[in-house]
Amino acid sequence: MNLKTQRLELIPLLPYQLRAWVEDRNALERELDCTYQAEPLEGVFLEIVKGQLAITEQHPEEYLWHSFWFLVRQSDRVVVGSADFKDVPDARQEVEIGYGLGKAFEHQGYMTEAVQAMCDWALAQENVAHILAETERDGWASQRILQRCGFREDKRGETIWWKL
């Protein structure tokens, strides 16, 4: 189940594809006919992906809520970024979204396109009423993405929580 925007194809990675991203990116690129140029899969980001991989493998039927979605530019099949829902919708019918973009692709509107499409899809599901996002207090670019997608500031502390 892929989503398409004006410039992007959003591909939610199946559990075995998420594992391939961690273990054999070249094989995944061949399978998806793409070239990965998004944020480097290392450090804290790699640990986050591995954590989501474990959950996705335990609950493959809910992979759309746990796996990462590749943001593939349609014109040349370059993966410019990734995004994910961090868990299944909770009892309040809320789900959190996270996202990251390769540095070379910042400030071109790709993430706004992707976040809007993913939020539209999520809100069309019967168990989702709201989408949450967390940004750093100085994460101006990320905050602008959320504002363009209709999010409003919900709580402010060490970080800022947003709600759609």
Where are these regions (language model features)?
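Conserved active-site tyrosine of GNAT-family acetyltransferases
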Residues: 146
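Glycine-rich acyl-CoA binding loop
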Residues: 107-112
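Conserved beta-strand-loop-alpha-helix junction that forms the acyl-donor binding cleft
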Residues: 133-143
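Short acidic/polar active-site loop segments enriched in Thr and Asp
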Residues: 129
